[in-house]
Amino acid sequence: MEKPLYPSQYMRITEGYMKGSHRDSYAIDDAGIDQGIDYLKAPYTGVIKKIYQKDANEIWLESIEPVIYPDGTVDYLTMLFAHDNDISNLFVGKVIAKGERFYEEGTKGEATGNHVHMECGKGKFTNSGWHKNNSGHWSINNAKNPTEC
């Protein structure tokens, strides 16, 4: 079992959860060290379960084994990442090793400035991977507060 790691080398949260465009969701935006494009490393060994290229190049990465959450519980973890400008190297079914560089900040979709939008959901990828929340925004299924992932 793995303990998930924060996927970015730098943490500069430009929009937190439950406010702004993240109202009614546990999404966070991380813009890295500066306005440039920083890369992300896989927080755990996972498999890409879905790619949605019609908006912000969203991908869903599901852990291949249960992970240990900060509170000690053990379950699968699925994360949603958005805004990479080029995901041509990614495909559904691709396995990405923990610590492997796999995604970058970007501006694809409705984004202002380079950043990555991240959400985590407890358990395996379910249904379409997301749902429309009470604010009319799309949010990952089985969402968890990012401090609990």
Label every PLM stretch briefly.
Residues M1-E62, P66-P70, K98, T107, ...:
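Surface-exposed, glycine-biased beta-strand/turn segments
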Residues S25, Y76, G113-V116:
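Short edge beta-strand segments in beta-sheet-rich domains
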Residues A27-D29, A82, E119:
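A cross-family glycoside hydrolase active-site/sugar-binding cleft signature
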Residues I33-Q35, D86-L90:
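Short alpha-helix capping/helix-loop boundary micro-motifs
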Residues Y52-L61, L80, V92-G93, V116-G121:
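Enzymatic toxin/effector payload domains
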Residues P66-Y76, F125-S128:
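Short, solvent-exposed loop/turn segments that connect beta-strands within catalytic domains
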Residues T78-D86:
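Beta-strand/loop nucleic-acid-binding surfaces
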Residues K94-C149:
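Conserved, short, structured surface segments that act as functional micro-motifs
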